[in-house]
A protein has these predicted regions:
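Asp-based, Mg2+/Mn2+-dependent phosphohydrolase catalytic module
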Residues: 1-5, 115-116, 123-206
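Glycine-/small-residue-rich active-site loops that bind phosphorylated ligands and cofactors
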Residues: 85-88, 107, 142-143
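N-terminal helical cap/lid subdomain that shapes the substrate entry/recognition surface
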Residues: 2-95, 115-118
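Alpha-helical elements of Rossmann-like donor-binding domains used by nucleotide-donor carbohydrate transfer enzymes
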Residues: 23-24, 46, 59, 63, ...
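Short beta-strand segments
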Residues: 9-11, 109-113, 169
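Substrate-recognition/cap helix-loop segment adjacent to the acidic, metal-dependent catalytic center
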Residues: 29, 93-140
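Generic structural signal for small/hydrophobic residues in well-ordered secondary structure
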Residues: 11-14, 54, 110, 135, ...
């Protein structure tokens, strides 16, 4: 079994990188309840995902301000202070990535839902990107997970065999999306759980 898989694809946010709007909005709002309401009703996940799929940040911001003028300053903070949302790398998972690279047995890729406008900031900040054999960014491709077509981009571009490929993501929806194109998915919860899952399916770690 340990000779079966030869490719591992990583999600970034929530797996290798700590990104969270709370880092900004805890400085703006007084209570967690206010933050929760704002993120669920104004700058929603669905809204942010549109930009992950390539919609321009300035247009998205202008349109949302027009819809919710009473929240203009708070809405503009979302992308205006985006760098403050970008936390540290998740060290234990990055260490796993290093171990996989050092083994020399696996091709390593990243497949991320991320705006093409903000992704360069992450690329500059984190050294571990050099470990990847390829990176596919939703904002550059104008499509995103869990669309089957998005997974097929990375398969076709790098000539991957889905049957020999593992995909790791903290979103179950995205894991299931990968499985629709024949990739083996792992729903990420924490580094220890990931390490156990990888070893269980025959991936060799130091």
């Amino acid at each position: 079994m340990n000779n079966f898989f030869d490719t591992i694809i990583f999600d970034l946010g929530g797996v290798l990188i700590d990104w969270n709007p709370l880092y900004v909005y805890r400085k703006i709002f007084k209570t967690e309840e206010e933050i929760e309401w704002f993120l669920e009703n104004v700058t929603t996940n669905e809204w942010n995902e549109n930009q992950d799929a390539g919609y321009p940040l300035h247009k998205a911001t202008e349109e949302l301000v027009a819809k919710h003028p009473e929240w203009e300053a708070e809405i503009k903070a979302y992308y205006g202070r985006w760098l403050e949302m970008l936390g540290d790398q998740l060290h234990e998972t990055v260490e796993l990535l290093h171990q996989l690279k050092q083994s020399g047995k696996y091709k390593l890729y990243a497949l991320t839902n991320w705006s093409a406008e903000t992704f360069p900031h992450a690329l500059k900040r984190f050294d571990f990107f050099k470990l990847f054999d390829g990176i596919v960014v939703s904002g550059e491709e104008k499509m995103k997970k869990p669309s089957a077509a998005f997974y097929k981009i990375i398969i076709d571009r790098y000539h991957l065999d889905p049957d020999k490929t593992i995909f790791i993501d903290d979103s179950l929806r995205n894991v299931k999306g990968a499985e629709t194109v024949g990739i083996t998915g792992i729903h990420f919860h924490n580094p220890s759980q990931l390490k156990e899952k990888l070893q269980r399916i025959g991936i060799e770690l130091f």
